[in-house]
Amino acid sequence: MTYFVLFLGLCFVLGGLAVASKPSPYYGVVGLVLASVAGCGWLLSLGVSFVSLVLFMVYLGGMLVVFVYSVSLAADPFPEAWGDLGVVGYGVGFVMVLMVGMVVGGFVGSLDFGVVTVDSVGMFSVRLDFSGVAMFYSCGVGMFLVAGWGLLLTLFVVLELVRGLSRGAIRAV
């Protein structure tokens, strides 16, 4: 199980690297999906199933919609793939900066791969992440509304930025 969790962590980092290496938006979407699936699978394997489900729905429901609209409205005649020299250069540069930062920060020798879960202890039947469901819906309502409004605003900003000189999503009535 520990190897599976480490594999999901590696997939999460590689997905983030695939988005950060600035390929064409077509390939950036694939990296975003890989990172979100691996990150939510990582949380799921650690026992945080509700938070994993909420984050997965936010990632794929919000951020992926913005990527899909930007890809459909800004088509590249010659998209950059992950094998192009510039994209590989960015990827190698990010990995080198990460490795130098770990060596300089002293994290290399102190990495501990112990994995713990958030399961309930003893005879308790309620897991720890399910006790936070009430907090999501009672105290977190305002934050959900702010996050939803931010995603909607981001969608309209991206649509306005990629529309060019033609009529876009927001028109004067």
From Swiss-Prot:
The keyword Protein transport does not apply. The keyword Transport applies. GO terms for cellular component: mitochondrial membrane. It is found in: Mitochondrion membrane. Its EC number is 7.1.1.2. The chain crosses the membrane at residues 1-21, 27-47, 48-68, 87-107, 139-159. It catalyses: a ubiquinone + NADH + 5 H(+)(in) = a ubiquinol + NAD(+) + 4 H(+)(out). Its main location: mitochondrion. Keywords: Electron transport, Membrane, Mitochondrion, NAD, Respiratory chain, Translocase, Transmembrane, Transmembrane helix, Transport, Ubiquinone. Pfam families: Oxidored_q3 (PF00499). It comes from the Eukaryota. It is a multi-pass membrane protein. One of its GO terms (molecular function) is NADH dehydrogenase (ubiquinone) activity. Core subunit of the mitochondrial membrane respiratory chain NADH dehydrogenase (Complex I) that is believed to belong to the minimal assembly required for catalysis. Complex I functions in the transfer of electrons from NADH to the respiratory chain. The immediate electron acceptor for the enzyme is believed to be ubiquinone. PANTHER family: NADH UBIQUINONE OXIDOREDUCTASE SUBUNIT ND6, NADH-UBIQUINONE OXIDOREDUCTASE CHAIN 6. Belongs to the complex I subunit 6 family. This is NADH-ubiquinone oxidoreductase chain 6. It comes from Aethia pusilla (Least auklet). The gene is MT-ND6.
